[in-house]
Amino acid sequence: MRYAFYISDGTALTAEAFGHALLSMFPVNFEHKTLPFIDNQEKANEVCKTIKKAVSDSGEPPLIFHTFVNEKLKAKITDCGGICYDFLDHFIAPVEKELGVKAEPKTHRTHGVHKNYNFRIDAINYALDNDDGKRLNQLDKADLILIGVSRTGKTPTSLYLAMQYGIKVANYPLTDDDDFERLQLPKELKQYRHKLFGLTLSSQRLHEIRSQRREGSQYASMAQCRFELAEVERLYSREAVPFINSTHYSVEEIAAKILAKTNLERHRY
């Protein structure tokens, strides 16, 4: 199997994100290796050995996506037998020309500690404290309240929005015992109607997810899944709650669709 490396003298998050996005367009399997904080010659020498071993093991030069500020370290990595792609070099010159300003590369600037980092930490703590309807007295502080039946992806989506964008997300489970038969929002949520966003998915997918947790139970049965989803979607429509069907989407895609529909402010950079 061919190797793909994501290497940097910083976090390697930028190289990894660009590299994965690019390689996802090709029907080729790769062995992925991310190597962050390669910030001295000794580490670069070890990485070079790893790359050369990958060439030997696979019989093909690995693809190397890198973002180095240190030119000497970059030169070392590009001379190790891989096919290198430097995203920063590719774009810096035309951006410098457009802005009329020379770039001042600095490690850890992209993903360092700054104001928006604190937004993300606060949002993560909020998501953990307000998972599954735990603290209804804090809903006024939410930027967004995700609702849906059990196991529709509310928790991972809440945490992803917090970690990536610094958005405070609470989530509240809708259960057939309390809410569906009346087809109205729980009283705790009514005053926050403008913050609500619903999640749903196919009954088959919900059945599969619940069966992994409680196989053979009424909770996981296809009939129960169909009932809950039909009722909650009727509730969304009646109460004018925006929602998406997340059956075929990753958590990243779900988050992106929510942001597109809600226009929430992102605190990423």
Curated annotation (Swiss-Prot):
> Which positions are annotated as binding ADP?
G148, V149, S150, R151, T152, G153, K154, T155
Instruction: List where this protein forms a coiled coil.
Output: none
EC numbers: 2.7.11.33, 2.7.4.28
Q: Which GO terms describe its molecular function?
A: ADP binding; ATP binding; phosphotransferase activity, phosphate group as acceptor; protein serine/threonine kinase activity
* Reactions the enzyme catalyzes: [pyruvate, water dikinase] + ADP = [pyruvate, water dikinase]-phosphate + AMP + H(+); [pyruvate, water dikinase]-phosphate + phosphate + H(+) = [pyruvate, water dikinase] + diphosphate
Keyword tags? Kinase, Nucleotide-binding, Serine/threonine-protein kinase, Transferase
List the Pfam families. Answer: Kinase-PPPase
Q: What does this protein do?
A: Bifunctional serine/threonine kinase and phosphorylase involved in the regulation of the phosphoenolpyruvate synthase (PEPS) by catalyzing its phosphorylation/dephosphorylation.
Which NCBIfam families has this protein been placed in? PRK05339.1
Q: Which family does it belong to?
A: Belongs to the pyruvate, phosphate/water dikinase regulatory protein family. PSRP subfamily.
Protein name per its UniProtKB record: Putative phosphoenolpyruvate synthase regulatory protein
Taxonomic source organism? Idiomarina loihiensis (strain ATCC BAA-735 / DSM 15497 / L2-TR)
